[in-house]
């Protein structure tokens, strides 16, 4: 979902191992590791931040993550990058600030391991930065250089020019390089280079092509999605669209891929490679007491110094009133990795001192177990008895189940079930155009899914008007209203598909 659409919605396993699309470094971060920290505010030109990011990406791909970026300093309380770095301190070896304010010295330090550089023009409107990042993704030991000064520095260090992408389009770079690019990951970013510094590191790490998805798509983005669809397994799109969310997610869904909103995410090449946290977050799920609302499923509280710690006594567990309606409050946008890495931890949201006063369901990307396990672990450690985590939307990632080709639905079910098990979640939030039973049944068939909340795209997520249904003995509940949104005037059409049995 779009980061700007933060909404509070009101509502009246074991799976076979699935080859997930997320890569890992040959060596994960552990106590023997060393992370060089670089402050991006100390870098004068944003193009040089892209250079550092591409360096960080192939270092993580080659051996182990060795670079982590913060805004100013590692002790900055407002900088979320620095906050997550502090969570790693001690558990993942040495935090080295030698190059904190000297990215040139950082390049000199790693120059002997570089094979070349790719020149780009950050001011190009035709995708020069995306083209250069794609070239670095496809190659080995390459960094992208966007300024004459950085190019000159690299030349002086004995790093040769490998390719000039200053006038190259992102589409041309993709076509020329796709033989050595991933066929399961793609990164979508504006061709004007405005977000190139964010996902460049993870793109290079994952060998992902980088290209724009404009409003309604174009031939270049169609070609990238078609390549994902040609893979044997489901794919994933990182970054975000540049125009129309519905068209973007629909195109990905039809192409057998899901989206992770991550256009402003940074340091994923490091955060996704943690030995102590990765794939170790699943917690035994306990059945709530009889009659307890699904949204109030409890989690064992752990002692922690983070927001929410110690409040399980202050906020008593809510008990339902007999013969009354049950209302569940669910916070949207937890699929947005940028938000989870950023302001979500702060006092306006999960870090609120009032959190825990009432039961709240927090949508949360179950893929966090693979991509940002430290964020998920931090959230769980700080959870009160009134906090529940709900996978989605729409499971493995953001997609429309009714748009997924029939021959891909089992793959989405398997990936969703596996990620829900890894993240310890058993409630699923789905967004779709229409609640078609045949599209939801595969997801509900997963042993990992206990119940499903369905939000319609449009109509304030509430096109089902609070209706409920039972599929395979599992609850499907539709949203009643969205905080701050007008009430829907009509239900979403069923598009001629088999209707849910509405109770």
Language-model-derived ranges and their functions:
Residues 311-429, 435-454:
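Catalytic alpha-helical scaffold of carbohydrate-active enzymes acting on polysaccharides/glycoconjugates
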